[in-house]
């Protein structure tokens, strides 16, 4: 588990992992019973793979947890974004561009944690940093000259249904609905 930020409690990573474990237990229990083994984990045909607003698919544990979250909350569009990404909708590119209504998270909505592991790659002798993508291209012999330090980071995302996108950016919302219509 991650290192606590304070002496009083668990880290953001620990909280996210606890939430994920609780969700798995809850879903497993909901499927138990007389005919539980016949029930699918997810309602068939209702959801596609979760993505961020830019269209990049989530993977691994994040994808599984976001699918469970969508199923539990009844979200029809599995698209997620951080608070900062929502705020980017409110930035205009030009000074004389007309200000559109502000995009925001709906009052009372809560974010959902996703976790991302990033890697810092440092040359053992020169202490020079290189990008993870560049490190992966090195030969095994060249890789031995570097130390790799993983870092687990937690981000908090909102489903697009938790925002006012439908009301203030109807053209964008229509594109999302078309993408996920069945």
Residue map of PLM features:
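N-terminal accessory/interface modules of nucleic-acid-binding and processing proteins
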Residues: 1-182
């Amino acid at each position: 588990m991650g290192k606590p930020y304070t002496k009083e409690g668990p880290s953001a990573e620990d909280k996210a992992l606890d939430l994920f474990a609780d969700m798995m237990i809850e879903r497993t229990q909901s499927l138990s019973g007389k005919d539980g083994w016949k029930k699918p984990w997810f309602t068939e045909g209702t959801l596609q793979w979760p993505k961020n607003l830019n269209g990049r698919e989530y993977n691994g544990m994040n994808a599984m947890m976001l699918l469970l979250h969508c199923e539990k909350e009844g979200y029809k569009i599995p698209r997620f974004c951080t608070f900062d990404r929502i705020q980017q909708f409110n930035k205009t590119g030009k000074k004389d561009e007309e200000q559109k209504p502000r995009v925001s998270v709906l009052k009372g909505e809560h974010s959902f944690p996703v976790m991302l592991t990033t890697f810092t790659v440092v040359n053992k002798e020169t202490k020079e940093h290189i990008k993870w993508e560049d490190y992966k291209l090195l030969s095994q012999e060249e890789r031995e000259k570097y130390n790799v330090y993983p870092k687990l980071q937690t981000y908090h995302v909102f489903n697009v249904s938790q925002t006012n996108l439908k009301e203030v950016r109807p053209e964008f919302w229509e594109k999302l609905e078309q993408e996920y219509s069945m």
